[in-house]
Amino acid sequence: MYSAQSSISKLTNLCEISSVEVGQHFYWQIGGFQVHAQVLITSWIVIAILLGLAILATQNLQTIPTSGQNFVEYILEFIRDLTRTQIGEEEYRPWVPFIGTMFLFIFVSNWSGALLPWRIFELPHGELAAPTNDINTTVALALPTSVAYFYAGLRKKGLSYSGKYIQPTPILLPINILEDFTKPLPLSFRLFGNILADELVVAVPISLVPLVVPIPMMFLGLFTSAIQALIFATLAAAYIGESMEGHH
């Protein structure tokens, strides 16, 4: 009897140690509104990291680039080539800053979830995590992409842009409209689901076993996080290119 109670007690303690809080939020009360503090705090940190790196990268630029300048130029060329491939040679240039901002913010946000020890900072409710670990952030990233999609099409084609909704036949009008207005959903839910699952897969083993064992999972998480940033940026650019080409 004592052995059974001892085993149950150990199992309970193990479950408490390995627990990961999901869906618990810490709010700031500002006026009559509740502001999701966790997302704002981590987003500000990510933005500060990006601004700091940008300032460091643009200091002392030289005609013959150093290794650090070469690295930054490689990133910029990668974003430029990605945008050009998806949007096209003639129209891609104005969209490079938008696609680059999306890619870099998501990339750093995703990696922050794997590399920064967010959970050592205690909050009254919930835990700090990567900004993209929250559906509010991923939706906030997907909505501007949807707006950019419609803006690009209207800017290029004017009111004739709406004619694509009755192609190839007017019967498809409701389906074509629904397709366009639901584009933010797969973007936001794919990013949110993958980053949340990645953090949970890494967090539980780390809480159960020594640090060395989950290291392969952490590297896998870094790879997955980078791929998710690339997928989001590629799809955003592809949507914009599609709206200007006027075909599905």
UniProtKB/Swiss-Prot annotation:
Pfam families: ATP-synt_A (PF00119). The keyword Membrane applies. SUPFAM superfamilies: F1F0 ATP synthase subunit A (SSF81336). GO terms for molecular function: proton-transporting ATP synthase activity, rotational mechanism. Keywords: ATP synthesis, CF(0), Chloroplast, Hydrogen ion transport, Ion transport, Membrane, Plastid, Thylakoid, Transmembrane, Transmembrane helix, Transport. CDD domains: ATP-synt_Fo_a_6. It comes from the Eukaryota. The chain crosses the membrane at residues 37-57, 96-116, 134-154, 200-220, 221-241. The keyword Oxidoreductase does not apply. It is a multi-pass membrane protein. It is found in: Plastid, Chloroplast thylakoid membrane. GO terms for cellular component: chloroplast thylakoid membrane; plasma membrane; proton-transporting ATP synthase complex. Belongs to the ATPase A chain family. F-type ATPases have 2 components, CF(1) - the catalytic core - and CF(0) - the membrane proton channel. CF(1) has five subunits: alpha(3), beta(3), gamma(1), delta(1), epsilon(1). CF(0) has four main subunits: a, b, b' and c. PANTHER family: ATP SYNTHASE SUBUNIT A, CHLOROPLASTIC (PTHR42823:SF3). Key component of the proton channel; it plays a direct role in the translocation of protons across the membrane. This is ATP synthase subunit a, chloroplastic. The gene is atpI.
